[in-house]
Amino acid sequence: MKKAYGGVVVSPTGQILLREPAGHYKGDVWTFAKGRPEADEAPERTALREVLEETGCRAEILGRIPGSFETSRTVSEYFLMAPLENTARFDGETQAIRWATPDEARRLILLNERPKRRRRDLRVLKRALALFQSLHGSLRA
């Protein structure tokens, strides 16, 4: 299995940053930034780089989201992140970005075509929100 690392960026008010992959790659309509590490790249560095490249958001890591999340060929791990700066520039792998409330994020993730990827992203979202709440108290969104 290949490894990938990504980030769930959550604003101080509990808004979730989602990306719309170009051409809805692999059936993903809205998802989180993630990707494979470059040579000798640490998981945290990979996640920060992928978030910046795919969303244009510079972020800082708040903590590791518990668990690993498997699809057919990849095991992904995610980090909870706080936004630092939005550069408004993202790579060609992304056609749009969007901030969403937790409920909106759930609805957007349900648009993904592949059930396994939908389940993965819903699990990631649930665990990210639980970690966010443990660090910051209840959501104010």
Ranges and model annotations:
Residues F32-I65:
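The catalytic Nudix box helix
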Residues V9, Y78-A82, T101:
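Short, well-ordered beta-strand micro-motif
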Residues L52, G56-T87:
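Active-site segment of metal-dependent pyrophosphate-handling enzymes
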Residues K3, V75-F79, A96:
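Short beta-strand micro-motifs in enzyme catalytic cores
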Residues T13-I16, H24-K26, E38-A39, C57, ...:
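Short, charged/polar surface micro-motifs in flexible loops or helix N-caps
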Residues M1-F32, G63:
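N-terminal strand-loop-strand
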Residues Y25-V29, D91-A141:
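Nudix hydrolase/Nudix homology domain
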Residues M1, S72-R73, D91:
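A short, structural micro-pattern
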